[in-house]
Amino acid sequence: MLQEWKAMEKPEEEEIRARLAAAKEKLAKQQLLIKEQKIPVLVLMEGWGTAGKGSVIGQVIQNIDPRFFKVESMGEKSEEECRKPFLYRYFRRIPEEGKFVFLDSGWMDEIVKDELHGKLSDEDYAKRIESVRRFERQLTDNGYLVMKFFLHIPEKEQAKRIGHLEHEKDTVWRVSKNDLWQNRHYEKCEEAFSSYMKNTNMPSAPWYIIDAKSRKWTELQVLETLTQGIEIALSNQKLAVPLLQNVFPLVQMPLLSEVPLDKEIETDEYRKELKELQNRLGELHNRLYRKKVPVIIAYEGWDAAGKGGNIKRIAGALD
């Protein structure tokens, strides 16, 4: 997408100032309607290192009541997060009804980094892309407004900004190893970003590429796009978009009427088999723990059918 993208013509400074004032006023009014209509707004701010993601978020939130927003900057994963599905830590940070959450780099950044540094096989990368598509679709199906921005700057502009930051002792800390790596491998990163955006660009959650060479022009593009998205969401909360088909393989189960209820087992045989199976389950549990495989066991059934007792016997085999 980045290779085909063409930047809009930048307006004169006077026009930028006038449009900025109008966009800020519009967002200040819209936040109250967002609260009234209980629409959750998730803003993903992605882009190149030194493109100004944090700065533009800082400018946008000045127009929103502090009670109505949170800004999340994702650091290294905790031990708990490493054991959960990779989207788990992002799901925990999604906004509640009527509020905004701004993600200063999110799941795109994580996936593309892992893919570029060889931490994901082609198969794992494809699975993550599909997980993202389903996750974002799940959010929009449940009334979320998902706005995805990518701040784009040319290779020379990024190198120039890195040089300026490194020149001052008070700003050198802002240049990360990843920023330097990106600039050295700009074309490779550009291709990876483009591929990711192409694969996750959906009608219900499209990508907005922002020309980030100028700070005020960047702010104006983000604000105008955000307010347009909010305006559409306020007038049409339920977007008419088709549901994705379920592609998960399902185990064929018999109908309830086909399940035999007359089977019995002798007490001694039951106790013997139960002990053997509990021992086997304990061994499998240890293997699952070593391989960090999460397991969910769900119980349904008639009242007094023995769900609680069965859970106790299963749990008795586990640490």
Label for each model-derived stretch:
Residues 1-319:
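Glycine-rich phosphate-binding loop of ATP-dependent small-molecule kinases
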